[in-house]
Regions:
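Divalent-metal (Mg2+/Mn2+/Ca2+)-assisted nucleotide/phosphate chemistry catalytic cores
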Residues: 100-221, 227
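N-terminal catalytic cores of NTP/NDP-binding nucleotidyl/phosphoryl-transfer enzymes
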Residues: 27-88, 193-199
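Short, hinge-like loop/turn segments at secondary-structure boundaries
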Residues: 92-97, 143-146, 236-237
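Short, conserved acidic/polar surface loops in the N-terminal third of protein domains
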Residues: 86-91, 137-139
């Protein structure tokens, strides 16, 4: 599974760390030292199956551990099938609703298939944290909890916000970072990879591993994919590109991405060289040709998730349900988030129906019509829904 030789090329290691990490604990220098030591490190990345899809944000960490695997290190993909039933409180202003065993099992059915689109299965092994967490006794849990104080937990921003707004905090929410932290102990980990929203949880694991095993775990905090709102890209904002999205849907979503995000996505979520990226957008500068950059970025993501043949397929009009007029049709197709925005595009002459610019909100649409937006999104009405 893992190569017999550990690659210790300092320049290559620095480039890997530069591209996708934001912070490293205990330090960048220590990480470089260990990666250049010639020793095989056991490094893991964990995903809780709280939903059925792995998305663009996950690929940052997956591409990072892929690079570490290619250096010869032992990579573990940890499926948090036990922790998913509790729910990570990170970033939540209310407690997560616990998931059932059945829901978690359903969510993770295609996880390995999705992950293998990014990192070949021969470069990592899989573990599930129910293997050790489900066997813990109440005595074990009390011992685990004794390593941290309530004060250490409630300093977290989300808990402070709930206290301020008089919203409840469940005791089980304090246990989540302890359980995630114990994963490192159970697997005797040398390093953990996660987004910066997971920093607290990963540092809990670092402290627990030091106390239980006397090991000083490396924590690789990756850069986060920030959406147009300035916050972490989220499903609720409709910005998430899932690895299971159809080729045309991936293209539609990429074409709607804010121009300011293009370089970041190319850096974090593809394996394209910096030379390729710089040719399209220099760091700190606007894209040279935003539309062309989006088209090429869409091609690359489709290629990564669905293969070369799907790239041509993604350029075809996406078949979708439409309405009886142009406004309701582009709204139903997901080209715009609201009726007002749909009307704006029509007023601007940014919508074509069958090759003709339409400036009438009430312009009738029918099955078979091809509608194109100024962003290059193209749909074919397969079925008319009259509401």
């Amino acid at each position: 599974m893992f190569g017999t030789k550990i690659i210790t090329d300092g320049k290559g290691i620095k480039e890997i760390l530069d591209r996708r990490t934001e912070t490293i604990y205990p330090s960048r220098q220590e990480a470089e030292k260990r990666l250049e030591s010639g020793n095989r490190l056991r490094i893991y990345y964990g995903i809780d199956p709280t939903g059925p899809d792995i998305h663009l944000g996950h690929t940052i960490q997956l591409l990072f551990i892929k690079e570490l695997a290619k250096l010869g290190h032992e990579i573990i993909l940890l499926i948090g099938d036990f922790t998913a039933r509790i729910g990570d409180p990170t970033g939540k202003d209310i407690a997560r609703k616990p998931l059932t065993v059945e829901q978690v099992s359903s969510n993770m059915k295609t996880y390995l298939e999705q992950v293998s689109k990014i990192i070949p299965e021969n470069l990592f092994k899989v573990q599930y944290n129910h293997s050790w967490l489900s066997k813990m006794t109440f005595e074990d849990v009390v011992k685990l909890a004794s390593h941290f104080t309530v004060q250490q937990m409630i300093v977290r921003d989300m808990f402070q916000e709930r206290i301020k707004n008089e919203k409840p905090i469940g005791i089980h929410e304090f246990l989540y970072p302890l359980m995630q932290g114990y994963d490192s102990v159970a697997m005797k980990i040398d390093g953990e990879v996660g987004g910066n929203d997971q920093t607290f949880n990963m540092l809990v694991g670092r402290e627990l591993e030091r106390e239980y095993l006397g090991k000083d775990k490396l924590v690789f905090v990756s850069r986060l994919l920030v959406g147009s709102s300035g916050k972490k890209m989220s499903k609720s904002e409709g910005e998430i590109i899932a690895l299971t999205d159809e080729p045309q849907e991936i293209r539609r979503k990429v074409l709607m991405i804010n121009d300011t995000m293009l370089r970041t996505i190319a850096e974090l979520c593809t394996e394209k060289s910096y030379k390729w990226i710089d040719e399209r957008q220099l760091e700190g500068q606007p894209p040279k040709n935003p539309r062309a950059f989006k088209e090429e970025l869409a091609d690359e993501l489709v290629r990564m998730y669905h293969g070369e043949k799907a790239v041509n397929e993604s350029h075809k009009p996406r078949k979708t349900s439409g309405g009886t007029n142009v406004v309701s049709s582009i709204l139903a197709a997901g080209i715009v988030p609201s009726v007002s925005r749909a009307k704006e595009l029509v007023n601007q002459g940014a919508i074509e129906v069958n090759g003709e610019v339409v400036k009438d909100w009430g312009f009738k649409t029918k099955k078979g019509d091809i509608i194109k937006s100024g962003k290059g999104i193209e749909i074919e009405i397969e079925k008319v829904i009259d509401k």
